[in-house]
């Protein structure tokens, strides 16, 4: 097959400072190419990366992008010129796999010339745009909660919506042995933003810390607004909130093997997101599971696609007025039960292997073949 893929305007693909979506999309593109398909990947231009190259069998085209802002409506406007440029550069293909706000709408206008089937990669919670996508052939959501939201907003789409979860590179995110006795190393990795529930996390850890002597919490992630963070003032607010609790802040890690090493160096990975209409899947908790870290997540529905409370991880009620207290109690229970942590770690690592890039690349390709046959 000839497959053309386009990511969004705000982050480059690796080896640039890619987001999770750009990273996993690049992985899928390489797997498609390795299976003999002709693959083109359109992404944002980045200093030090050529505008055109072939890498891992994938033809890369890089276009002028934009800096993201803290305002959703501004980002939607900024997406338009990039999507217009990408729509003009999409090559003739059997499948166009598109992940940008305006691009599916614009691409549908020229599909007759290119003869492509249009697949929308629904990596993010919908913002009403699916009403514009009547010309597409498939909408592939990364979680059941995203699929349900799309159908709610655009009921016409129900017959063409399916779910294929985000993949992780299980050759990089490999499990490491842990003792779980003694002080524990807690880690959050993600954007430093209020919607990630970090105030709940810091308050909860500060309450739990006296019962877990020697245990530490590291908060690692992008804080700059251009990278999706909330800016330096919010980081200082979190530092003040932490007080004397053993909490350390670190800059984001974009290089994959270094990030995997950071996950292997922690015991418990906490991802307390409160983004009811922002969280779509949760790649970071799944990658943490793959390394043997025990994931602790909020009760957002998207996490249930890979995490079962008490079996492969733990869930706390982030919607409760006592969310910090709920989290603190859970951290103490886990921190004083090493055998439970060992069981959760083993089950989580085994479950994460079901999300390997090779397995999910084959699911995508089978779906494309079915579209073309139909």
PLM region spans:
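Short hydrophobic beta-strand element within catalytic cores of glycosyltransferases
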Residues: 294-297, 307
